Amino acid sequence: MKKWLAVALAAVLLLTGCAPKFEKNKEVVQKTDDKTEKAFIPNYQISNKYYRTILPFKPSKTRGMVVANLNSRYDIKEFETGLMRIAKSEYSPEKYLFQEGQILDKKTVSLWLNRKYTAKQLKDEGLEASDNIGLNPLDDEKGSIDDRNKKNPIYLAHVLEQDYLVKTDKDTVKLGGVMIGLALNSVHYYQKEKYGATYERKIPHKELKAEGEKIAAEVARRLRGMSELKGIPVTIALFEQESKSSVVPGNFFEYATVDANSSSLNAWEPVKEKYYLFPDTTSEKDHRDDWTFFMNFKQDVEKYFSSNGVIGRGFYKDDQLTDLRIEIPIQFYGEAEAIGFTQYVAGLIMDNFPDYISIEVNITSVNGPEALIEKKPKEKEPYVHIYK
């Protein structure tokens, strides 16, 4: 399906005069501190909005850790793609190539995610003194388990590295910049006994921000001490992940850069991005007009089929709704019914929402995906695909 959509997208771009750049594969040499490797730059670039990756693809040295450390699939996806969005402000896709992190390995990140330890705790954990590099606060083991977790929650959930390569001459690329994402917990989960009930300690944003900035400063210091990053600019971004029960992802809220010849962070820059669930009391309170658009759409859908499962996830940038993804679970009893309903929904999209919003509607049944509807900003007609 992804391959089919890619072909369809290419066709649309060609028809609208915005064709992707189709160039020959470019063989280059990738230089690191201790070796050189041959690599290829892909010949297709769909848009200047996306980074090219060099081939063969190198998976991150911390591959798989993000799945275990973040609360939901929504957070996992947004943590990676959101960091790439921020990267564009520092490393242009027209100049830089993307590569998954090759400097921080699993052992390093695992140790960073630990708490600080006392000498006794180190011994109990079977760790050496050199391993006592955790970025989360010490548990002094004073007071009840509740008191200890409320006093010193786990703030840092994960560290994500993204590398951005730049051409140094016609046939050579090297590391040009690094993005580091720090995933921070908005809720700290703990247990009073093994396999016991799970308890929560909510972490206010102000507290999260302050602790995140302290952690970022220490991460910047450590990164600058690595030989691989000598003279390389590093940007660190703070991500507030949502609770385990949330059906929308968290968001990055600020970032700062360590210049190539510096070991300290520049001033923090705000990131004005946020996801909202529709319908929901928070979206109703913060974005009443958009909430009304969605509710009118939902009510019109339910005139055709009674469904309480119509939900939307809206992405806001600078307090403006830019993307809305809608899920409609429906039980169909025939293909004609599915086609008719899809056409009806496509019309509702055009009637109910402003034309500056990018909209994606996924219609599903117990059998899986039934139809996809996409409407890009300013387009006169939506793209519709009915799965066979």
Language-model region placement:
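Bacterial signal peptide processing site
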Residues: 19-22
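Polar/charged, Gly/Pro-rich intrinsically disordered segments
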Residues: 240-287, 306-307, 315-320, 362-388
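C-terminal motif of bacterial Sec signal peptides marking the signal peptidase cleavage site
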Residues: 13-17
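Short, non-transmembrane amphipathic alpha-helical segments
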Residues: 201-228, 336-358
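Intrinsically disordered, low-complexity segments enriched in Gly and acidic/Ser/Thr residues
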Residues: 277-355
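Short edge beta-strands and adjacent turn/loop segments
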Residues: 153-188, 305-330
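N-terminal Sec/ER secretory leader and immediately downstream segment
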Residues: 27-174
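Sec-dependent signal peptide recognition
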Residues: 2-8
